[in-house]
Amino acid sequence: MAERFPLRPITPDEFGAYCEVPSQAFNDTEFPAEGIEQERVVFEFDRSIAAFDGDAIVGTAAAYSFQLTVPGGIVSAGGVTFVSVLPTHRRRGILSAMMRHQLADIAARGEAVAALFASESVIYGRYGYGSASTELQLTVRRGEGALRAAVAGDAGAGSGTGAASGTGGGSGAGGGPVRLRAGWPAELRTELAKVYDSVVPHRPGMMARDERWWQNLLADPEFRRRGMSRQKCLLAGDDSGPRGYALYRTKPDWGEDGLPFGRLWIGELMATDAAASATLWTDLLTRDLIGRASCRERV
């Protein structure tokens, strides 16, 4: 295996060809040029692994250097990504060779954890991985969901109109009424980071973000929208500063009855206290013209 499909890191000039392999392996559309350039912002070329068949890249794996919150503290972690093998080269030991190579590198770097989001979790048990958490995708149709009474009480009676009026409902850790402000993520970058950095140390599974990762998250190229709107931001706070935020997208739609039934996708919702969280959720779940709100991860 090692002689037939040698492994090595890629150079920046090889990144385009490298990105084509996971696109084919995951049956995805072609990796757009703007996506390749955006990924370069965070990609760590010295942590890349490519398996070659002659001059062609046939397998890929990579890792990001993270600080990961676990119960009891924060540890260095390798965020495993880009794991793929071309359909034409499956079952030839390429994946196993890349995994062994990568795990040895993670250990040599002194990282305590190797973590990844698995498309097929059963694959990775062979290499020592185990399930650390589960992923929930949630869709709430308008009128079919509600916050628990105790949580809804934190949001206050007026939070449902907070985005329009600039005022929210309840109070919480900040000590004052929660107010909502609608805006664009890039304009609120400082406030978003303040909330996120406050949450990270207290929530296992969270990964600290540096400037590169904020740039990657807030970039809004067309291919990420998937037919929905620009990424929008809803900020919750009081006189003491920001206490929460939601990043989301919308898409107008109409039901068979001719009534509005738009979609709202929550990409990330973070809050430092229950009142701010409840105020954000209440606003997003009661938007006019929205028939269903969905979320997955990072909420």
What residue spans do the PLM features occupy?
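Conserved catalytic-core motifs of GNAT/GCN5-like acyltransferases
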Residues: 117, 130-148
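An N-terminus-focused feature that recognizes amino-terminal "leader" regions
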Residues: 32-38
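A short helix-loop-beta-strand connector motif used in the catalytic cores of GNAT acetyltransferases and
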Residues: 40-59, 79, 134-135, 218-234
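Acetyl-CoA-dependent GNAT
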Residues: 44-47, 52-73, 81, 248-254
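Intrinsically disordered, low-complexity, positively biased terminal segments
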Residues: 1-16, 30, 53, 70, ...
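Acyl-donor binding region in acyl/amide transferases
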Residues: 77, 85-113, 117-118, 126, ...
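Ligand-binding pocket scaffold of soluble enzyme catalytic domains
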Residues: 7-30, 41, 46-48, 59-63
